[in-house]
Structure formats: C-alpha cells, structure tokens
C-alpha cells in the first residue's frame, strides 16, 4: 500500500521524477520498472488519463484510480489561434479555476509562456491578470501541464519557457523551482532556455538564489525583472507593490542575486505611450542600471479593456531604443504576437470569468 495514500495525501503523477515514480510502484508491490513506464507515458507520450497507460496491469490501473491517483492533466476549455500562429489556451484545473498558457512559434523555436498563479495579487495598473483577482498559487503539475498542452497544440516540443503568464512567480517559489527541475530533467528543456519574470517581491530574490542552488544544483535560468519605470515615483504609479519595495532596495537585491548566481539579469520594460516612453525616461533608465551585467527587453503595450493606456508609435519606440543604445545598453524589442487574439497576459481568463 502506498504510504502517501495512507497519510491521506493526494497523489498526482505529473511533476514527479523517475525515482519517485519507481518508489510509488514499489509501495504497491509492483516492480520499479513500472514507475519508469509511467514516466515515459507521462512525459514522452503525454498521456492524459491513467487508464490510457496500457502497458500497466489493468488491475493496478483500476486500484490506482479507485484510490484517487491521477495523472494531474488539466482540461482545455478554450483555444484561440492568432493569424501569426500564436496559440493561447485556457486550461481548467481540478477545482475549476482557469489559467492561461501561450505558445509563440517562430521558424526555429517554440516559446511557451506559462502561468504560476490563478490570477495575481500585485495589481500592476496595465495588466489584465489582476483585474480578475487572485485565487491561489499553482501546483507543480499545473505548471508542467501547460508546457505539455502547448506541445500537444503544436505537435512539437517547446524550445523555450518563460514564466511571464498569470501570477507572480516569486510568490510561488517552491512550485516554480520544482517545475523548472521537472521541465529540465523530465522533459529535457535546458535551464538556459527558461526565464523567470518577477515584478519584485520583498526579500525573495536572495531566497530565490539560495533555493535554486539547493534544488537545482546550479542556476542557469534567466531572471527577468519587470522594472517598467526608471524612478520610484513613476514605478509606484504603475506597480503598486513598489510602495513597499523601493527601487534602490530592489536593485540592491538584484546585485546580491547576481553575486550568488553569476547570472545576468534581464530588465523588462513595458512602453506606455507618453507615460514612460520619453527620452528623459530612457536616459534615467540607462543611469539606473549602469554597472549591471544586464539586458533590457522592451515590450510595446498590448491595450486591454478598462484601462486608458495606449501603445506607443513605432517612432517613439525606436527613439527610446536609440537613446539606450547610445548609452551602451544592450536592448531588444519583444515582437508583439497574437494581437488579434487577445494574447496579452490575463485577457482570455478575464473575459471568460466575466462571461461566467
């Protein structure tokens, strides 16, 4: 009998590594290779239901199902396909919460944008996710499933993973790091192709560095800090959490993170027309991050309902980039994908929730 079941804990197969699945099999009196078979069918074949793992003895499958063991796969409730090939999925959890995952294809790569929470509590003024409120953090299998679901939608393995969907990853550090371990070791996606984005949460950056080293052995994923403003006053207007986490304290923690991990930090900066996209803002930003081993990723705003912010003109975007480049800042502009299908973070869930 499975010890975990005797303790009354829910047993979800997705998110568990080979060793844990082998142990599970042995706790039921099955040989260890049964655990390896479950692992193969979960991660390579992408099976959704336990009864579909036909290589397992039928009696054991029935026993597992009767005792509440499940794969942990989520249900796809809606799919949007943009003209550029971007696919956004609305997935439903076992407790009927909705989360989003987005697949962004190019010729050579498939980037999957995953959510770490149901909703978000950070309240960034320009973001649709917070409009629907915060419900809870996601479990490991719910994060990993998003990658498998995008793989199914495109019939190819995602090459890159970005934790830039719904939620604040650093408010769910344990599950995020465990899911990174699973994506790396069980799905074969290299850490260097994984990015974790944060708006900044007090005391979490040093914790992230230390926990990542403990759980992953080494830190190779990229940390992306969603800065969005070059000074404290403007950041407080756009990112309410900045009121309790001053920008200089945030950057000090970034330096500490860099010292521990040795990994370059990427700064995310969403451009809002006439709000934070002026020449003086670009100059301030260059001053603010001088001395960092960093890269600035500019994001042209995707308009959402209920907010008056606008997307800057291409001329204003190019001017902002030129100022940064003239100051020696490594900068890129994220290509806007899925604009015709509400691909901005949180839009699909927000609309679905309002309809319900």
From Swiss-Prot:
Binding site for S-adenosyl-L-methionine: 167-168, 197, 226-228, 302
Pfam family, one: Radical_SAM
Gene Ontology terms: cellular component: cytoplasm
Cofactor(s) for this UniProt protein: [4Fe-4S] cluster
Gene expressing this chain: rlmN
PROSITE patterns the UniProt entry points to: RADICAL_SAM
Lineage, uppermost ranks: Bacteria, Bacillati, Cyanobacteriota, Cyanophyceae, Synechococcales
Cofactor: binding comment: Binds 1 [4Fe-4S] cluster. The cluster is coordinated with 3 cysteines and an exchangeable S-adenosyl-L-methionine.
Subcellular location: Cytoplasm
Annotated catalytic residues: 100 (proton acceptor), 345 (s-methylcysteine intermediate)
Enzyme Commission number(s): 2.1.1.192
Name of this chain's protein: Probable dual-specificity RNA methyltransferase RlmN
Function recorded in the entry: Specifically methylates position 2 of adenine 2503 in 23S rRNA and position 2 of adenine 37 in tRNAs.
Family named by the database record: Belongs to the radical SAM superfamily. RlmN family.
InterPro entries: Aldolase_TIM, Methyltransferase_A, RlmN_N, RNA_MTrfase_RlmN, rRNA_lsu_MTrfase_RlmN/Cfr, rSAM
Residue span(s) of domain Radical SAM core: 106-340
Keywords of this entry: 4Fe-4S, Cytoplasm, Disulfide bond, Iron, Iron-sulfur, Metal-binding, Methyltransferase, rRNA processing, S-adenosyl-L-methionine, Transferase, tRNA processing
Catalytic activity from the UniProt record: adenosine(2503) in 23S rRNA + 2 reduced [2Fe-2S]-[ferredoxin] + 2 S-adenosyl-L-methionine = 2-methyladenosine(2503) in 23S rRNA + 5'-deoxyadenosine + L-methionine + 2 oxidized [2Fe-2S]-[ferredoxin] + S-adenosyl-L-homocysteine; adenosine(37) in tRNA + 2 reduced [2Fe-2S]-[ferredoxin] + 2 S-adenosyl-L-methionine = 2-methyladenosine(37) in tRNA + 5'-deoxyadenosine + L-methionine + 2 oxidized [2Fe-2S]-[ferredoxin] + S-adenosyl-L-homocysteine
Domain of life: Bacteria
């Amino acid at each position: 009998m499975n010890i975990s079941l005797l303790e009354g804990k829910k047993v979800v197969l997705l998110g568990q590594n080979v060793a844990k699945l082998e142990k599970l099999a042995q706790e039921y009196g099955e040989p260890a290779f049964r655990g390896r078979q479950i692992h193969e069918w979960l991660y390579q074949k992408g099976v959704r239901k336990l009864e579909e793992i036909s290589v397992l003895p039928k009696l054991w499958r029935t026993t597992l199902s009767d005792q509440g063991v499940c794969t942990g796969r989520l249900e796809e409730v809606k799919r949007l396909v943009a003209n550029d090939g971007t696919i956004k999925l609305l997935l439903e959890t076992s407790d009927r919460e909705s989360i989003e995952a987005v697949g962004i294809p190019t010729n050579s790569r498939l980037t999957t944008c995953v959510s770490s929470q149901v909703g978000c509590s950070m309240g960034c003024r320009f973001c649709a996710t917070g409009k629907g409120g915060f419900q809870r953090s996601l479990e490991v299998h719910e994060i990993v499933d998003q990658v498998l679901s995008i793989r199914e939608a495109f019939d190819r393995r995602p090459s890159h993973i970005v934790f830039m969907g719904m939620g604040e990853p650093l408010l769910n550090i344990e599950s995020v790091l465990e899911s990174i371990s699973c994506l790396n070791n069980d799905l074969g996606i290299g850490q260097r192709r994984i990015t974790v984005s944060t708006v900044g949460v007090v005391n979490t950056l040093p914790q992230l560095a230390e926990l990542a080293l403990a759980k992953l052995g080494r830190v190779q994923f990229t940390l992306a800090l969603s800065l969005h403003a070059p000074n404290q006053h403007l950041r407080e207007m756009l990112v309410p959490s900045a009121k309790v986490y001053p920008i200089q304290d945030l950057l000090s923690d970034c330096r500490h993170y860099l010292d521990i991990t040795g990994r370059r930090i990427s700064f995310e900066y969403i451009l809002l027309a006439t709000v934070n996209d002026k020449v003086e803002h670009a100059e301030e930003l260059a001053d603010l991050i001088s001395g960092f081993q960093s890269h600035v990723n500019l994001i042209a705003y995707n308009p959402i309902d209920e907010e008056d912010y606008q997307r800057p003109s291409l001329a204003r975007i190019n001017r902002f980039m030129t100022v940064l480049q003239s100051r020696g800042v490594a900068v890129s502009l994220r290509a806007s994908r899925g604009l015709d299908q509400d691909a901005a973070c949180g839009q699909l869930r927000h609309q679905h929730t309002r309809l319900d």
